């Protein structure tokens, strides 16, 4: 009667193949995560620019941080910092409301906005 099962060589080959697949997939996954974080920072920067433009018109001049963050969508404001509802993205505003720093997942972008 012949024993059923896998030989040690067959198991070793499968483990090597799985190791190669993991070595290829993990760096790509990390790169995709970085790209997603950068895309989120860029989208948030565009939203801050729009909010700043609206607040500038409403304030008839340079707006305050509170005016720029007046209607946070899906997040909360504490002082001069807006945080997304899942705590993954933050937007900080300086006292004169002309510099905004956006951060998410190690990616950061600074906006210097002025009123013309």
From Swiss-Prot:
The chain crosses the membrane at residues 6-26. Keywords: Cell inner membrane, Cell membrane, Cell outer membrane, Membrane, Methylation, Periplasm, Transmembrane, Transmembrane helix. Disruption phenotype: Deletion mutants show a defect in twitching motility while DNA uptake seems not affected. It is found in: Cell inner membrane; Cell outer membrane; Periplasm. It is a single-pass membrane protein. SUPFAM superfamilies: Pili subunits (SSF54523). Residues 1-5 form a propeptide. PROSITE patterns: PROKAR_NTER_METHYL. Glycosylated. Plays an essential role in forming the main structure of the narrow T4P pili that participates in twitching motility. This is Type IV narrow pilus major component PilA5.
């Amino acid at each position: 009667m012949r024993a059923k099962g896998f030989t040690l060589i067959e198991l070793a080959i499968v483990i090597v193949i799985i190791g190669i697949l993991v070595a290829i997939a993990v760096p790509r996954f990390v790169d995709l995560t970085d790209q997603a974080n950068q895309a989120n920072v860029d989208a948030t920067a565009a939203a801050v620019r729009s909010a700043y433009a609206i607040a500038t018109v409403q304030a008839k001049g340079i707006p305050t941080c509170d005016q720029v963050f007046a209607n946070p969508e899906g997040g909360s404001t504490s002082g001069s910092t807006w945080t997304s509802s899942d705590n993954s993205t933050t937007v900080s505003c300086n006292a004169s409301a002309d510099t905004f720093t956006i951060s998410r997942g190690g990616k950061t972008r600074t906006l210097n906005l002025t009123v013309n």
